[in-house]
Design a protein with these regions (language model features):
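Conserved ABC ATPase "signature" region
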Residues: 5-22
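Hydrophobic anchor residue at the start of the ABC signature
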Residues: 40
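Conserved catalytic motifs of ABC-family nucleotide-binding domains
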Residues: 47
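Catalytic Walker B motif of ABC-type/P-loop ATPase nucleotide-binding domains
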Residues: 51-54
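Short loop immediately C-terminal to the Walker-B catalytic DE motif
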Residues: 57-58
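Helix N-cap at the start of a conserved alpha-helix in ABC-type nucleotide-binding domains
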Residues: 62-63
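H-loop/switch region of ABC-family ATPase nucleotide-binding domains
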Residues: 86-87
Length: 113
């Protein structure tokens, strides 16, 4: 059963991803990076214990990427488990506890950070 999400939680999630004040815009007016951040906001609204992100910084500019990294670090401090998939190890190296490298669907390297 999903939690009831109120306006307070929605506005807080939008603020966490840098979309504060944009809640009344139609989604079609959002840039690709804004849509990426909206998806991240939707993921964190229900306060799940596990978050899975696939290429989360792909459509974000440098400031948006840093904002996402800050958000991930905050979520980690709150005890959340986070799984990040990325083609760019440098993007996740500084925020990961453990990295698995895969090739052709197989784990070829595993290391703790």
């Amino acid at each position: 059963i999903r939690n009831q999400i109120g306006e307070k939680e929605i506005l807080a999630a939008l603020e966490q991803v840098g979309l504060s004040g944009k809640e009344n815009l139609k989604v079609k007016k959002y840039s690709l990076g804004m849509r990426q951040r909206l998806g991240i906001a939707q993921a964190i609204m229900e306060d799940p214990d596990l978050l899975i992100f696939d290429e989360p910084t792909n459509s974000l500019d440098k400031a948006g990427s840093q904002s996402f990294i800050d958000l991930i670090l905050d979520l980690k401090e709150k005890g959340k488990t986070i799984l990040l998939a990325s083609h760019h190890i440098a993007d996740i190296d500084g925020i990961s506890d453990e990295i698995f490298e895969m090739e052709a669907g197989q784990i070829i390297n595993r290391r703790k950070v």
